[in-house]
Amino acid sequence: MNSILAIKNIVIESLSQAMEKARQEGQIPALSVDISIEHPQKTNYGDYATSLPLRLAKATGKRPMELAQILASYIETGSGISKVSVAPPGFINFTFSKEWLCSLVKTILTEAGSYGNINMGGGSRVQIEFVSANPTGPIHIGHGRGAVLGSTLSNILKAAGYYVEEEFYINDAGSQIDAFKRTLFARYQQALGKDAAVPQDGYHGQYMVDLAAEMVTKYGDKYLQMPADIAQNDLGEIGMARMLCLISDDLKALKVDFDIWFSERSLYSGGQYKTAMDILSGNNYIAERDNATWFSSTLLGDSKDNVIVRSDGTPTYFASDIAYHYNKFIERKFDRVINIWGADHQGHVSRMKAMVSALGINPERLTTLLFQMITLKRGGELVRLSKRTGEIISLREVIEEVGADACRFFFLARSTESQMDFDLELAKKESAENPVYYVQYAHARICSILHLAEEKQLDYSTGDTALLGEEAELELIRKMAELPEIVETVSRTLEPHHLTYYAQELANAFHQFYKDCRVISDNAELTCARLKLVDASRIVLARTLHLMGMTSPESM
């Protein structure tokens, strides 16, 4: 009975049973309703509350307060609940027992690094595809936000009992790759003193000049000694591989790694594109008109049909999407697929659902998360260009300036659908104003207390947590209790910003406890009990930081 989710289920079940008893007693009619509970903003209203009486008042013909009192009269305390009360205008409140709260400290110390894990997923296979930037240039902070969203959701879903694979889809086919190769070959020739023009549709950033210089340093004029078309292709392949290495390095600096780097080309060379097209054709979702091949997505409720193969015979991006999702769902047998895309892909979502359905797959198994972009600021001023290059600021530059932990926290700090400002100056402040510093300082403060206890040779292993009873102590335990619930919420909603809010609330609860309660004192028994609480706080805060992909510093 040591999980808050178990307590939550007991509360919901007790409300359901109270409704049934009230019905049997003729006090309310038979009703079907979803029962929901939440944490009140103020703990003097209890630890859980429900507005069920307010929702049932009209159907029962009773005033909400009267209905609340009727239902509460059928609910017994126990199983971690010490008090059931009613409050205007019609709430039923539930309060955790002190005994349950104190016992939770022992549970946390026992579970240690696995505290917060739940078995929501039951081993279900989930694939999360994110970043998937074109290998034609450096990644920027928009890619960084998507990267942190993806890796954090992966951490959370693993903690919730899912099997998760993280994947980067390499867009190594199509016109952008051809433009990249033509650009690099032109820059390579220029670096060797030859007259060559960068194509108008090419890549004009300084990074291409630098990449060409790197090729000259490594290969000299080797690629001038062969036919131009072969040289352009071969050099372009090397350049693209190098760009992918740079992208990978930047992501690793952000503490983002992938299980799979999946090549778009392999969909064609491996026959998956043809197989997927055969399925769509067999299901009558392929049409030929205007010398092009179309996916009849309007048959599935989309606003328009979509071209799969252009009139010149080249596949569209959507053609690759079809083959890729055939590969994900049918060949690799993922139970659920999550795509994390920038908000500029909004128009693609409905056709993706239609395509998956046309392949014979339940479209509910595909989730596309769209995230808004980031506005970079320094104090109150917009940061548009890099001071170093005069071009759009890269993700690497931001990481180098403020650190990976600050990047990850701020990228997570708002819901995906919210645009966000990232203040570089705030991210570097060593004060409570900076939420990253505030949260990590709480962990460092915890570690300093435990180090002091070690220096004093205090053995708190036999400490009795039943001695804990100060309001600040119990508030801290209440907040620690919520971690499994946060894992469940984020796994269900796919909204990892809840983690940043929770981390700040947990840090605040610890700082308040530290202010109100002297940990190491002349009272040996109370000292041991509080040291146990401090150690449990360390575990929960470190676990929260880990789920966000951040470090837990022992000193600051």
From Swiss-Prot:
| Keywords assigned by UniProt, alphabetized | Aminoacyl-tRNA synthetase, ATP-binding, Cytoplasm, Ligase, Nucleotide-binding, Protein biosynthesis
Chain ranges for the short sequence motif 'HIGH' region as given in the UniProt record: 133-143
- The EC designation for this entry is 6.1.1.19
SUPFAM superfamilies per UniProt: Anticodon-binding domain of a subclass of class I aminoacyl-tRNA synthetases (SSF47323), Arginyl-tRNA synthetase (ArgRS), N-terminal 'additional' domain (SSF55190), Nucleotidylyl transferase (SSF52374)
- Recall the GO molecular function terms of this protein's record: arginine-tRNA ligase activity; ATP binding
Q: Which Gene3D superfamilies match?
A: Arginyl tRNA synthetase N-terminal domain, HUPs, Isoleucyl-tRNA Synthetase, Domain 1
Task: Identify the CDD domains for this entry.
Answer: ArgRS_core
Please identify the protein, giving its name as recorded: Arginine--tRNA ligase
